[in-house]
Amino acid sequence: MNLSVIIPVYNEVESIKVILGRVQDTKLAKEIIVVDDASTDGTREVLRKLDGKRGIHVLLHPRNKGKGAAVRTGLAAAKGDILLIQDADLEYDPRDIPELLKPIQEGLADVVYGSRFLGRAHRVTMFWHMVANRMLTFMTNILYNTILTDMETGYKVFRRDVIGNMVIRANSFDFEPEFTAKILKRNYRIFEVAITFNPRDYTQGKKIKLYDAFEAVWALIKYRFVE
């Protein structure tokens, strides 16, 4: 198994070294691809110093394009046969990576989602943010006849061939619904694994806004009927 961990980053100077250290400590990643989406807080300077060390490969966007664009850049550069998307903000704990990989390693799944709603320990989160996540997941289940608990999770793991002929167009937070819609329409085997979760609030730099929820709704509807 060759695991590529893809980390999209935007203005995470306080957490980037910590998250990279935690991923490295798992000793599972053959490469760690960090895509900086034109950070302005010193993150880029930190990453330049880390580039090439202990499997870290840094890619720099010349201008801010959005999380989805950063993920797509990372996917295009990844060489592993299993790909894992890891947020840089410490909400998702890399110590969960071994459990996320198991269903794929055991031949039970093509795609694994780390679910924040399956009962593992988590910090109390903002009510309306939780409601929005639940509603988007419920909408996904209705449109695509599935029983996911957490469509919007930032932890997604999948075999490389899953995206072999898949065109992802999302540039922003609509990556999650677009990717989910397309794997469901292709009937890939999806497992969900319970993860720990330590959510940030807007004062701590959480970047998801109301507009992103509307964009996600549109993506779910659109990709139900096209591609």
Predicted regions and their residues:
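Cell-envelope/extracellular polymer assembly enzymes that use nucleotide-activated donors
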Residues: 2-4, 31, 178
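A conserved hydrophobic helix/loop-capping motif in glycosyltransferases and polysaccharide synthases
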Residues: 3-12, 19, 26, 35
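Acidic helix N-cap motif at the loop->helix transition within catalytic regions
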Residues: 14-18, 41-50
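Short beta-strand/loop segment that forms part of the nucleotide-sugar
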Residues: 20-24, 29-39, 59-61
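Conserved donor nucleotide-binding strand/loop of the catalytic core
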Residues: 30-33, 44-77
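A conserved acidic beta->alpha catalytic loop
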Residues: 36-45, 90
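Acceptor/aglycone-binding surface of glycosyltransferases and processive sugar-polymer synthases
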Residues: 61-77, 82, 94-173, 198-218, ...
